[in-house]
């Protein structure tokens, strides 16, 4: 019997750049399939940007056939207009997944950072570095846009929440990176 396979799509919503990452999981082993950004800066009209988000997310879903979507929740430190636009962008990405019957899980930015680095206040660079080490991503595959690794981080966070030893055993959550390494020595070298 082959190990269970699934594909997790992670999304970091944005109205200028929207990051995404695709994670292929076989059994309990994740592997990077793809990551990238959807560039929206050339569109002046917000509604055209929303259509572009829907079209590109739908295209990625049709290309990679994810089983689940993990999406970062909007950060509440921005102004009201920014929050409204970001919420619309997130909603359109979610609608694209729902149109293809893909279940969605939303994670707070702090929760994603905590899951990846053990520190809910980690920088984008720290998150990217930890993902690169954990998934063994070669330097040439790393993108300069941190939105891509933020999207991938949402997928990896979802993997940890649904596939890790604590998810299977119903035990307590991993508290930090050291705790994760101690519980998962086979995942880190």
Curated annotation (Swiss-Prot):
Query: Which keywords does the record carry?
Result: Cytoplasm, DNA damage, DNA recombination, DNA repair, DNA-binding, Endonuclease, Hydrolase, Magnesium, Metal-binding, Nuclease
Quote the InterPro entries the UniProt record gives.
Answer: RNaseH-like_sf, RNaseH_sf, X-over_junc_endoDNase_Mg_BS, X-over_junc_endoDNase_RuvC
Q: Which reaction does it catalyse?
A: Endonucleolytic cleavage at a junction such as a reciprocal single-stranded crossover between two homologous DNA duplexes (Holliday junction)
Q: Where does Mg(2+) 2 bind?
A: 72
Cite the binding residues for Mg(2+) 1: 12, 147
- Tell me the domain of life: Bacteria
Enzyme Commission number: 3.1.21.10
Q: Name one GO cellular component term.
A: Holliday junction resolvase complex
Q: How is the cofactor bound?
A: Binds 2 Mg(2+) ion per subunit.
Annotated family: Belongs to the RuvC family.
HAMAP family documented for this protein: RuvC
Quaternary form? Homodimer which binds Holliday junction (HJ) DNA. The HJ becomes 2-fold symmetrical on binding to RuvC with unstacked arms; it has a different conformation from HJ DNA in complex with RuvA. In the full resolvosome a probable DNA-RuvA(4)-RuvB(12)-RuvC(2) complex forms which resolves the HJ.
Record PANTHER family:
CROSSOVER JUNCTION ENDODEOXYRIBONUCLEASE RUVC
The function of this protein is: The RuvA-RuvB-RuvC complex processes Holliday junction (HJ) DNA during genetic recombination and DNA repair. Endonuclease that resolves HJ intermediates. Cleaves cruciform DNA by making single-stranded nicks across the HJ at symmetrical positions within the homologous arms, yielding a 5'-phosphate and a 3'-hydroxyl group; requires a central core of homology in the junction. The consensus cleavage sequence is 5'-(A/T)TT(C/G)-3'. Cleavage occurs on the 3'-side of the TT dinucleotide at the point of strand exchange.
Q: What is this protein called?
A: Crossover junction endodeoxyribonuclease RuvC
């Amino acid at each position: 019997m082959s190990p269970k396979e699934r594909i997790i799509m992670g999304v970091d919503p944005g109205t200028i750049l929207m990051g995404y990452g695709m994670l292929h999981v076989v059994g309990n082993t994740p592997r990077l399939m793809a990551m990238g950004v959807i560039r929206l800066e050339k569109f002046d009209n917000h509604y055209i940007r929303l259509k572009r988000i829907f079209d590109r997310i739908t295209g990625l879903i049709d290309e990679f056939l994810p089983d689940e979507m993990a999406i970062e929740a909007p950060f509440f430190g921005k102004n009201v207009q920014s929050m409204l636009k970001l919420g619309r962008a997130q909603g359109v990405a979610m609608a694209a997944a729902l149109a293809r019957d893909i279940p969605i899980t939303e994670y707070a930015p702090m929760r994603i950072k905590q899951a990846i680095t053990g520190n809910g206040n980690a920088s984008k660079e720290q998150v990217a570095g930890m993902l690169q080490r954990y998934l063994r991503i070669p330097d040439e595959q790393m993108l300069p846009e941190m939105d891509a690794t933020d999207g991938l981080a949402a997928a990896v966070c979802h993997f940890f929440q649904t596939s890790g030893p604590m998810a299977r055993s119903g035990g307590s959550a991993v508290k930090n990176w050291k705790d994760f390494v101690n519980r998962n020595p086979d995942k880190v070298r």
